[in-house]
Amino acid sequence: MPPKNKEKGKKSGAQKKKKNWGADVVAESRHRLVVLEKELLRDHLALRRDEARRAKASEDQLRQRLQGVEAELEGARSEGKAIYAEMSRQCHALQEDMQTRSKQLEEEVKGLRGQLEACQREAAAAREEAEQALGERDQALAQLRAHMADMEAKYEEILHDSLDRLLAKLRAIKQQWDGAALRLHARHKEQQRQFGLTPPGSLRPPAPSL
């Protein structure tokens, strides 16, 4: 094989290696993107479950306390009515005591309701933060996808540019090789003519290979 063909084989192998390297980089980037999406989705779902569980537990606890206080208030009122009916002499004192107790219980109920509303506001704020985190994740994924698309375009541009340069070099080498073959053929033909020989048909110039 001529030296030029050996050089052509080496360059072709280097070109294939460079193309495979670019494909490996793109595949690895896509794999990392998929892993990142799964991790972010898992973290987001875990956060939402924890927040919902805490909010539900707080709401149930406050509701139970509220029901207990309301039951106690109703029992106190019923007890006051029974005492008033049975003990008229202590009616006024018991009324004052029950009214005071009722006010205290009502204040406690009011405070518990305020705590319940605060808990609901905190749950709403937690949901808003989770939605914001999800939006930031989507934005980060969009930026990563755009970066990957830009990388793919650059790799494709580099590959095409390398192929164009390689083809240009091969064309230049072919022209040099064809010119040398033609000159060698003409020289052999002239030498045979000098010795009175007829050039055989096998000494025709080589046909172009590109």
From Swiss-Prot:
GO MF annotations in UniProt: identical protein binding
Coiled-coil intervals, chain numbering: 49-161
Subcellular compartments: Cytoplasm, Cytoskeleton, Flagellum axoneme
Basic residues: compositionally biased ranges: 7-20
Record key words, sorted: Cell projection, Cilium, Coiled coil, Cytoplasm, Cytoskeleton, Flagellum
InterPro entries: DRC12-like
Disordered, as annotated region: 1-23, 188-210
Any one of the GO CC terms: motile cilium
Main localisation: cytoplasm
Subunit structure: Component of the nexin-dynein regulatory complex (N-DRC).
PANTHER family: COILED-COIL DOMAIN-CONTAINING PROTEIN 153 (PTHR28656:SF1)
Sequence similarity: Belongs to the DRC12 family.
Function: Component of the nexin-dynein regulatory complex (N-DRC), a key regulator of ciliary/flagellar motility which maintains the alignment and integrity of the distal axoneme and regulates microtubule sliding in motile axonemes.
Protein name per Swiss-Prot or TrEMBL: Dynein regulatory complex protein 12
